[in-house]
Amino acid sequence: MPIAVVTVLLLVSAALVAISSDAGLAPPGLAGLDVQWLVLLAWLTAGSASAVLLCCRRRRATTGLVVAGALLIGSGALVGPPRFSDDSARYAWDGIVSGAGISPYAHPPVAAELSGLRPLWLFPAVAIGSDGQPACPTPGSRLTRQTPDGAPLCTMINRPEVPTIYPPVAQGWFAAVRALLPREAPWWPMQVAGLLTSLGVTAALIA
């Protein structure tokens, strides 16, 4: 019975994580619910599963459920782009720049020198609003200006006017994740890398 309860709780937690990543997956009862509540519910169900596991002293079954839970909940986050932070846009961009043989510390994302590296998912097309001014219709994008010519530019990267702040070891990780992928590959490489890292840590803690 405890194993069945834990399995159900893990499935519910994974479903809540998936819904928090992509609101379009929400059933009618959860549609419109604030994403913070979804995350809280996911934590509560995962925590409840952990509590039941602590009471169930069957090591083999417990180990399998911990690994399965880590995989299920981590996979749930892959159904959509990150919603709580746009930092991964900078991670991906730094990896793309490094992969082109350019130091990510040399130029900010808005620099014209890097214009040939910009994928559309990180730099969506600029539109002209009803007032005749440039606008960024893509959700999550912000309007900035290319330097030095001042051309309007939309980007998903925060603080695009300044070079990266991430240290060399982090840059090595970003470059490694993006190394074998085309620039057009969007959010999922960093998400998958994060999931694999999480599973590795889980396995190390169990061993």
Task: Spell out what each predicted region is.
Residues 29-40, 182-199:
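Membrane-interface anchor segments at the N-terminal boundary of transmembrane helices
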Residues 98-187:
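Interfacial juxtamembrane loops and adjacent helix segments
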Residues 73, 77, 170, 198-201:
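Alpha-helical transmembrane segments of multipass membrane proteins
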Residues 46-55, 176, 188-207:
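Transmembrane-helix motifs of polytopic, lipid-linked glycan transferases
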Residues 1-14, 18-79:
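Start-transfer (signal-anchor) and selected internal transmembrane alpha helices
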Residues 73-83, 153-161:
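Short acidic, glycine/Ser/Thr-rich loop/turn "cap" segments at secondary-structure junctions
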Residues 84-96:
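Alpha-helical transmembrane signal-anchor/signal-peptide segments
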